[in-house]
């Protein structure tokens, strides 16, 4: 071993994407290494691969190779330890760029000129420097903006089931999201383990909506190495932190699919022969996910914010599966997609009853959205919950045997799903959402609107005479 360059010739062996070395006393966890095989035929130089130290045991190390290891002979491999951890060159010039999962250009353009090169394994925000999340990010989706408001600095995951249009919803939010008041806003989008069709569908959607110039795209493909999948969200967050806290932008980070990330984490852990935890996932998965999600927030004294909207697929539609279960402990609510609503053709199929934004009160209401936001949302939620109960009862006794009040609630539940939740791919402002909510509530007498203060009811314009009877006929006027 060369003590200056720390170059090692020869390796113990290879197991899948892992390269094992010995006689490396000064290696560091997370250190970047360069790997070169024997020269190819016709005198051509050997291809150089890169990797990262992921395990240490005395003077032995395990290196995760970022490229494939096929054709690499362990005995002839030459490994150079750089002494550096993984870093990413970041700048405001990354806006409008399409990058691979490691932050390298994937759009055929030169690399952005870096303003800084921070380590991608950044720490969570210092709790003593955190500012309370406030103000909302308008996604244009009524079930989120109206019922589960996304607040700047929040981490709000989307829980989906296999086959549901979670990717379509993620792309729609990237295209529609904005902040009020003309403040600078950007989106960082990171896809992990995306198949070919989905990979291009995202890019086509962003280009068609004309939002690529305010977006940084990180795309990790399904065929890329698992270690790259583990680095993709960290590269995206490193870029987002620079835009938010160095340039004062309000940044929304959309991560999809976190389940692909966790599968890669399990694959690497099994390759390292670690003792598995629940469902075969490593016991430190909670801590690992926390190092990603806890990078969201606001910093006291700085104008920007970093908001996260991670999307994950629940294996077997199981909300108690380790991935959604642990994610729910770290984050501040959840948006749940429903297979039943999707079967009925409702898009986006967001089930508002199990969905929750724990920080909604910090971004909705007087001075944030509208004075009537929380009361209207609470009243809609209450009627919809009762309507769902009536729907289950009607499946047993028959709709014809329901009373007038039950029929009105049943009609409201149907109209709520079709008119408010099922908006399709259109953009709705928060004003449009609240007015749609008021139209649904117009089918009830004022005395039934117990969640709405009297002053707000008096401030509303007179309702049409047909309004009180609108829901009794099963439709919303």
UniProtKB/Swiss-Prot annotation:
The keyword Membrane does not apply. InterPro entries: ATP-synt_VA_C (IPR055190), ATPase_a/bsu_AS (IPR020003), ATPase_F1/V1/A1_a/bsu_N (IPR004100), ATPase_F1/V1/A1_a/bsu_nucl-bd (IPR000194), P-loop_NTPase (IPR027417), V-ATPase_su_B/beta (IPR022879). Pfam families: ATP-synt_ab (PF00006), ATP-synt_ab_N (PF02874), ATP-synt_VA_C (PF22919). The keyword Ion transport applies. It comes from the Bacteria. One of its GO terms (molecular function) is ATP binding. GO terms for biological process: proton motive force-driven plasma membrane ATP synthesis. Keywords: ATP synthesis, Hydrogen ion transport, Ion transport, Transport. Belongs to the ATPase alpha/beta chains family. HAMAP family: ATP_synth_B_arch (MF_00310). PANTHER family: V-TYPE PROTON ATPASE SUBUNIT B. Produces ATP from ADP in the presence of a proton gradient across the membrane. The V-type beta chain is a regulatory subunit. This is V-type ATP synthase beta chain. The gene is atpB.
